[in-house]
Amino acid sequence: MAMETCFRAWALHAPAGSKDRLLVGNLVLPSKRALAPLSVGRVATRRPRHVCQSKNAVDEVVVADEKNWDGLVMACETPVLVEFWAPWCGPCRMIAPVIDELAKDYAGKITCCKVNTDDSPNVASTYGIRSIPTVLIFKGGEKKESVIGAVPKSTLTTLIDKYIGSS
């Protein structure tokens, strides 16, 4: 269905005589009759429109380090959840999918970052990180709370809800 819609939009907005070709592999496309519900005169007067739009909000975990820390965390207007982790840490691998889900669930409301403590030891030592995984919540460039260990998603959602509800 999505491919059919995108192809229909391409067919409507492709310039007449265009040498561009749509490569579709072995996909079966709808008939020409199904693609041309509008008259030629009407197609020519239509303004192009966007068929697909991406979300403006970041819905994935962003990697923070010593170079981008101030811009990503300290200057962020929305609350920021920061996970301190290391690749060799078993509990860190357990909580990583939870942090990924939270980034998607709260896209536009919070920013989720992760800091590899092996790659950015100065950031970790600045905030007294001695155990991983550790999750810190920042709001207005200020550390508000911390959670140590691989905790359930419900613990983190309760914490996040506390900070996205207040200004």
UniProtKB/Swiss-Prot annotation:
GO molecular function, one term: protein-disulfide reductase activity
Its biological purpose: Participates in various redox reactions through the reversible oxidation of the active center dithiol to a disulfide. The M form is known to activate NADP-malate dehydrogenase.
Residue stretches making up the Thioredoxin domain: 54-165
Protein name: Thioredoxin M-type, chloroplastic
Localization of this protein: Plastid, Chloroplast
Disulfide bonds: 89-92
Family designation: Belongs to the thioredoxin family. Plant M-type subfamily.
Name of the gene encoding the protein in the UniProt record: TRM1
Key words, A-Z: Chloroplast, Disulfide bond, Electron transport, Plastid, Redox-active center, Transit peptide, Transport
Subunit organization: Forms a complex with heterodimeric ferredoxin-thioredoxin reductase (FTR) and ferredoxin.
